């Protein structure tokens, strides 16, 4: 960790110079704590320091329970570590949040503390085991929430879900009834360990799938007798014999791994088809498009910025959101739509293999199921509006005023939400995964409603205070209208050209530092990367097709907003070239022919042709390498 510490020193010095703060004592503290505590100071202790800072922002003042692991000023409670920055955010006399608190100083503290918070390092076996224990514990809590779900709450859930999604679900239901689900194989692993082209020769189906999605309509090109032999060779599993999802851990942070559930091939195959139908209809539905569409995170970020500017919107964060969506919630959500209900239920795995032990699932699905994300959004958004309905009986509803501003319509008595009310709230409520945005007046009611359904609101990452106006959603953070989002180091720095994932991450880190205006830190990264590969400037320009800024060259390069100088010109194509490195990889050999190859053709989406060797190689590459050469600059 020597090089990362050096980078952190450069970064902290640069942040100090931007804010006019001396950081010499802070640098000594970091060096001493890392020597005594190891890398956990950077990956665990400093992120906790930032959590305490954000708690102080939400409270509007410093309290005694903050920064307990650091020496503090006895009068104000401010820690001495990074104290120069914190005095620009909190009053040095009484610890209250300053009216003119510096967004730059806040960014400096957060950037320093969170720089290594998401670095991918393997957890200790103890922490990994704790993650699996939490998975089991969450499953038990979902069962408890199901038992405590009152009849009144169920009726309200049914009514609000019909109000929000009846048109959407009717269209999806009709699409499924008309055999409009086109299955699709995902790129990842499956519980039966089929990869690449082998998935097109699947030999397992389930009786539950057969009732809704017959194999003759989804596994073979047609019901022609020539394919009967394939169907007869398939094993159709009864519900008791179905393969469980395989729960496994993948690196996330040093604090805890991420747990995902790897689905069986047949389930994932049909889940992808349902997901495609849902996403298409989301875009066509007035409510779903504005409330739960997953096409972009930008709407959430814009609303978070608005909330930080005027305090009108609160940002809520759910912990273990996908693992806390009960299957009972989903069954009630879809129960009036026969074909949609049957399709979602047939493609849901009922059992999970957790460290060799098979358990029956009360949750709908974990991360790994293709339908988890949209179904989670639909359920949680329904509960959010239940909370808003309850809160509206107390604080009223926003309504358009004569000058197109929002006034508040007071209710004389409790009443039910109407479609007009929902239209009024569009642009103020949005759900993206575990990130929720609601009007600040309803935040407390929504939180209570979510928790009554078994969801767990992470209060350390939820913000609604009007005076502090710090908001966070979908990876973007804002303070009083100013973007204070931080750059994170995701992987250890590369030592050689052979460390391809680390090299790609280092280039990405360098460019993120550049875009955040941390030019000295970006220069430090330039020096290290140039020792390993040619590292030219490449243009960072707007692309109309992608509707975003992208690099105009395929090489690993440093972004520039200015036109870049070419190393030479292509004599045949007359285009500028630059010498640089590109990452090349090959999919593993996985040959496919016969009926499976024909199905791959029929299931293809879009106009882009398949790779010429797609029947010879398929699946995620197992390794990659860096290739040096001359490549187009633009």
For each predicted feature, which ranges?
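Short helix/loop capping segments that flank catalytic or ligand/cofactor-binding pockets
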Residues: 258-260, 270-272, 323-326, 481-482, ...
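Conserved PLP-enzyme active-site core in the AAT-like
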Residues: 293-300, 446, 453, 479
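Conserved polymerase palm-domain catalytic core
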Residues: 308-432, 437-453, 460-477, 491-498, ...
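Conserved pre-motif C helix in the palm subdomain of viral-like polymerases
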Residues: 240, 244-287, 361-391
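C-terminal, non-catalytic extensions of nucleic-acid polymerases
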Residues: 1-257, 402-414, 511-634
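Glycine- and small hydrophobic-enriched segments that form the cores of compact globular domains
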Residues: 227-237, 241-243, 248-252, 256-258, ...
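Active-site-proximal segment of RNA-dependent polymerases
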Residues: 261, 265-315, 385, 401-412
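Extended, charge-rich low-complexity interaction segments
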Residues: 486-513
């Amino acid at each position: 960790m020597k090089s990362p510490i050096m980078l952190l020193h450069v970064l902290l010095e640069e942040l100090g110079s931007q804010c006019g703060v001396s950081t010499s004592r802070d640098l000594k503290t970091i060096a001493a704590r890392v020597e005594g505590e190891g890398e956990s100071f950077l990956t665990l202790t400093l992120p906790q320091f930032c959590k305490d800072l954000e708690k102080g922002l939400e409270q509007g003042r410093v309290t005694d329970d903050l920064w307990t692991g650091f020496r503090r000023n006895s009068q104000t409670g401010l820690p001495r570590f990074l104290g120069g920055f914190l005095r620009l955010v909190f009053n040095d006399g009484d610890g209250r949040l300053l009216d003119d608190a510096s967004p730059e100083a806040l960014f400096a503290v957060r950037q320093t503390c969170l720089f290594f918070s998401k670095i991918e390092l393997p957890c200790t076996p103890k922490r990994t085991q704790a993650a699996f224990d939490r998975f089991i514990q969450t499953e038990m809590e979902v069962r408890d929430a199901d038992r405590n779900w009152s009849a009144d709450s169920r009726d309200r859930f049914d009514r609000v879900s019909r109000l929000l999604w009846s048109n959407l679900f009717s269209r999806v239901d009709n699409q499924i009834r008309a055999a409009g689900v086109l299955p699709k194989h995902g790129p990842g692993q499956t519980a039966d360990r089929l990869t690449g082209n082998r998935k097109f020769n699947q030999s397992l189906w389930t009786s539950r799938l057969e009732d809704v999605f017959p194999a003759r309509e989804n596994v073979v090109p047609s019901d022609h007798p020539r394919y009967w032999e394939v169907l007869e060779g398939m094993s159709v599993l009864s519900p008791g014999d179905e393969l469980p999802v395989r729960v496994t851990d993948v690196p996330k942070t040093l604090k805890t791994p991420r747990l995902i559930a790897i689905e069986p091939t047949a389930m994932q195959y049909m889940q992808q088809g349902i997901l495609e139908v849902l996403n298409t209809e989301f875009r066509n539905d007035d409510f779903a498009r504005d409330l739960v569409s997953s096409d972009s995170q930008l709407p959430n970020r814009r609303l978070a910025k608005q909330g930080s500017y005027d305090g009108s919107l609160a940002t809520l964060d759910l912990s273990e959101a996908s693992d806390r969506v009960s299957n009972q919630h989903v069954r009630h959500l879809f129960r009036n739509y026969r074909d949609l209900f049957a399709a979602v239920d047939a493609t849901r795995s009922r059992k999970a293999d957790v460290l060799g032990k098979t358990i029956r699932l009360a949750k709908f699905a974990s991360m790994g199921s293709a339908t988890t994300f949209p179904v989670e959004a639909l359920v949680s958004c329904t509960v959010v509006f239940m909370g808003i309905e309850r809160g509206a009986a107390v604080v009223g509803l926003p309504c358009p005023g004569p000058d197109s501003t929002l006034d508040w319509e007071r209710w004389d008595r409790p009443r039910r939400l109407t479609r007009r009310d929902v239209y009024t709230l569009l642009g103020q409520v949005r759900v993206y995964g575990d990130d929720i945005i609601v009007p600040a007046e309803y935040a407390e009611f929504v939180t209570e409603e979510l928790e009554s359904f078994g969801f767990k609101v992470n209060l350390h990452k939820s913000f609604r205070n009007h005076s502090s106006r710090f908001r966070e959603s979908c990876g973007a953070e804002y303070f009083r209208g100013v973007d204070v989002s931080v750059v994170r180091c995701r992987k250890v720095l590369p030592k050689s050209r052979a460390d391809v994932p680390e090299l790609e991450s280092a280039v990405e880190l360098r460019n993120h530092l550049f875009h955040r205006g941390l030019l000295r830190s970006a220069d430090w990264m330039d020096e290290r990367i140039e020792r390993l590969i040619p590292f030219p400037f490449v243009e960072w320009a707007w692309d109309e097709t992608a509707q975003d800024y992208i690099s105009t060259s395929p090489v690993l390069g440093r972004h520039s907003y200015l036109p870049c100088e070419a190393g030479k010109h292509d004599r045949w194509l007359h285009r500028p070239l630059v010498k640089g490195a590109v990452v090349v990889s090959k999919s593993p050999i996985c040959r496919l022919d016969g009926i499976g190859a024909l199905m791959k053709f029929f299931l293809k989406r879009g106009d882009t042709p398949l790779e010429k060797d797609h029947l010879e190689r398929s699946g995620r590459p197992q390794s990659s390498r860096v290739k040096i050469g001359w490549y187009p600059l633009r």
